[in-house]
Structures are given as structure tokens and as C-alpha cells.
A protein has these predicted regions:
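A cross-taxon signal for low-complexity, glycine/charged-rich
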Residues: 1-2, 15-17, 23, 31-37, ...
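Bacterial N-terminal signal peptides
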Residues: 46-57
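Sec/Tat signal peptide C-region and signal peptidase I cleavage site
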Residues: 58-64
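Short, glycine-/small- and polar/acidic-enriched structural segments
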Residues: 65-201, 205-211, 215-221, 234-238, ...
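Secondary-structure end/capping motifs
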Residues: 258-342
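Conserved C-terminal helix/tail region of periplasmic/extracytoplasmic solute-binding proteins
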Residues: 330-371
Length: 371
């Protein structure tokens, strides 16, 4: 019984073992030794090569760490995670990732229980952190909100929103606040807007505009394509109002304390996924289209929506928000909705040192490649 595949190879004579152990004594292989090697049966050589390959594969599989990444929705905002899975970016980092769809609050509960490792419910996670939950934000996919404002023909500019009915998800949510800022920059007071809560379903709000129940609403990149095909027009990309990082990912403080190396490897895989979507949106859609839950959207619509989304992703290496962006995020996504007056130190909710390191490493690799 052989202990390993390598036992199939005949033992070398004593002379050969000495040569192998002390090659400096025999700087050039003798003709006899060459002939002796060449005389080995091909089956033996093939078995040895196969053994080496199998050992490498098994070793790689054993070393891969199993992790779970939760995203709140299987929409275009998280296409990059599916692309990172499909292209093996997490696997390249020694991680065997499983992507699951879990809504915000449930996702944070799963993170705290250890059932998942990373959560894309960044807003929910950081608001929970403010209440004492041991989680922190570790990256943001986008530097800006990804919303567009669409309207019926009666609304052509921000000033036209005065007295109009705006379909929103819920009062005070991120879309409501950003839409209000857009109106205020057009000289319209927040009090002059009529808000109608209709929930998060984009098609419901778009159809409300078509039936006259509302005049305008905010939509995500995929929703913009749907709205335009229904005859609505876009007043603009709300992400251009000001930098405010969006779609944050969080992990547990325990993970940060005990396994920062894994976090860096996960970040590298996730960021490479974002960069792949930006560089090849059509190919990325083809890779992720079976995972996305986008109803009856065609491939062309999804590609167009993906390009709309990419306006919010920073160049050249995404993931790390600007100082101004962090300040805006804390103000508009944390303090205002939670009615907090005192300042919030960023480090209370965020741990961005690791994504900063990963960003520098990727940039250094790009510079070496471009030389």
C-alpha cells in the first residue's frame, strides 16, 4: 500500500541520492544519469505530475476560508458582488464566499450571531452601531447616492416641484432627504412639497405618476430605465448634488479584532468586482444576470441601468470615501434621521484603515503593471 502518489516513483540509487542532496559535487548531469531519467516509464512520470497537481488543488481547497456575504437586495447595486463570485476574485484571496440576500435589520442580527461575515446593509448597521451594536462600516461601494429624479411633463426643473405631489418610500428616508435638497437648491421650500408615502417598490411609484396620483419620484439606476420606457423624463442624477458615500458594507468588531487579514482579502475581492463592472459592464451583466431579481427587465435594460449606476462609482479604485463624503454621510444618513444633535466621531461607526490599505496596494499594483 502506497502512502502517497510519490511512492509510485522508483527509489533513486545511493549515488543519485547523494547527487540530489549535494548538487555542488556534481555540477553537470552525466550522460548516464540523463539516460537513467529518460528511461523512467511515462506512466510513472504522468503519475508524479498528477500527484503534484492534486496536492496543489487539495491544499488550496483546504486553505480556503468559508465566508458568507449578505446583500439587502439582488439588484444592480450589488451586481459587483455576484461578479466577484463568478470571476473568482474572492477565491483568488483564499476565500470561499457564499452570497445571500437578507434584508437590513435581519442582516445585522445575522452578523452579530456569526451566521454571516459581511453585510451590505451599511446604513442599518451603522445606525445600530450608534445604539451600541459592535459593528463598523469597512467600505462603501459608491461615492454618491445612486438615485435619479423622474417626473411627468409638468415638472421640467427643480423649481417646478413647488406644490407638486412627490411619491416617496417613507418620510425621512435617504431618497426623501436627497430629493428635498434637490428641490431646495431650486428655491422650493421643503414645506411646499406634497409627499405621498408609497413604499420602496419602484414600479408602484412610477405607475402612480402615469395615473396622475403623483408628479415625481426618485428611482435607482435600474428604475430609471423602466421609468423612461414608461414615458417619464429624468430631472437629473441626484448623486451630483454632493458627495455622500452609499451602499456601505459592515462587519463585526470581533472580526476586525480577530481577523483583519481576512477583511483585507474580502475587500480586495469586492473592490475588484466593482472595477470589473466598471471596465466591462456588458460582460458583468452576463455573469450576474441569473442572480439578479429584476422582474421582466431585458438584458439591454440591465446594461443601461448598470451604466447609470456607474456614475456613482469613483475612479480609479473605489471603496474609500472622501472626508467631505464621510461628513455628509454622518449628517444626512445618521444624525438627521435619528434626530441627533451632537457631533458623531467617524471612528465610532467606521473602520476604514483596512480599505485604505487595500486601495494603496491595488494602486501600487496598477503602477507596476503600467511601467
Amino acid at each position: 500500500m502506497h502512502d502517497s502518489f510519490f511512492d509510485l516513483i522508483p527509489s533513486a540509487p545511493a549515488e543519485e541520492r547523494v547527487i540530489n542532496e549535494h548538487p555542488h559535487l556534481y555540477p553537470l548531469p552525466s550522460r548516464e544519469r540523463r539516460l537513467r531519467f529518460n528511461a523512467l516509464p511515462m506512466k510513472v512520470i504522468d503519475a508524479a505530475i498528477l500527484a503534484i497537481i492534486m496536492v496543489a488543488v487539495v491544499t488550496s481547497a483546504v486553505r480556503a476560508e468559508k465566508i458568507r456575504t449578505a446583500i439587502p437586495q439582488a439588484n444592480l447595486n450589488y451586481l459587483s458582488i455576484f461578479v466577484a463570485d463568478a470571476k473568482g476574485f474572492f477565491r483568488d484571496e483564499g476565500l470561499e464566499n457564499e452570497t445571500v440576500v437578507i434584508s437590513g435589520p435581519l442582516s445585522i442580527a445575522a452578523l452579530l450571531s456569526g451566521d454571516i461575515d459581511y453585510s451590505g446593509a451599511g446604513g442599518s448597521g451603522m445606525r445600530a452601531a450608534l445604539k451600541g451594536a459592535p459593528v463598523k462600516g469597512i467600505m462603501f461601494q459608491a461615492d454618491k447616492v445612486t438615485f435619479y429624479l423622474v417626473a411627468d411633463p409638468s415638472v421640467k426643473t427643480a423649481s417646478d416641484l413647488k406644490g407638486k405631489k412627490i411619491a416617496i418610500g417613507s418620510p425621512g428616508d435617504t431618497q426623501d432627504r436627497v430629493m428635498t435638497m434637490f428641490a431646495e437648491r431650486g428655491g422650493v421650500s421643503a414645506k411646499d412639497i406634497i409627499r405621498i408615502s408609497m413604499g420602496s417598490d419602484t414600479s408602484t411609484r412610477v405607475m402612480a405618476i402615469k395615473t396622475g396620483a403623483a408628479n415625481a419620484t426618485t428611482v435607482d439606476p435600474g428604475g430609471l430605465v423602466f421609468a423612461q420606457r414608461e414615458g417619464l423624463h429624468s430631472l437629473g442624477f441626484l448623486g451630483d448634488l454632493f458627495p455622500m458615500p452609499f451602499q456601505g458594507f459592515v462587519t463585526s468588531e470581533k472580526k476586525i479584532r480577530d481577523n483583519p487579514g481576512q477583511i483585507k482579502r474580502w475587500l480586495k475581492g469586492a473592490i475588484r468586482g466593482l472595477m470589473a463592472v466598471r471596465e466591462k459592464p456588458e460582460e458583468s451583466v452576463d455573469l450576474g444576470i441569473k442572480k439578479l431579481q429584476l422582474g421582466n427587465a431585458t438584458r439591454a435594460m440591465i446594461v443601461e441601468g448598470t451604466k447609470n449606476y456607474l456614475r456613482a462609482v469613483s475612479q480609479p479604485v473605489p471603496g474609500l470615501p472622501s472626508t467631505e463624503g464621510i461628513r455628509n454621510f454622518l449628517e444626512y444618513d445618521i444624525k438627521i434621521p435619528m434626530q441627533i444633535k451632537e457631533d458623531i466621531p467617524p471612528e465610532r461607526l467606521l473602520y476604514l484603515q483596512l480599505v485604505e490599505e487595500v486601495k494603496k496596494e491595488i494602486e501600487a499594483g496598477q503602477r507596476r503593471t503600467n511601467r
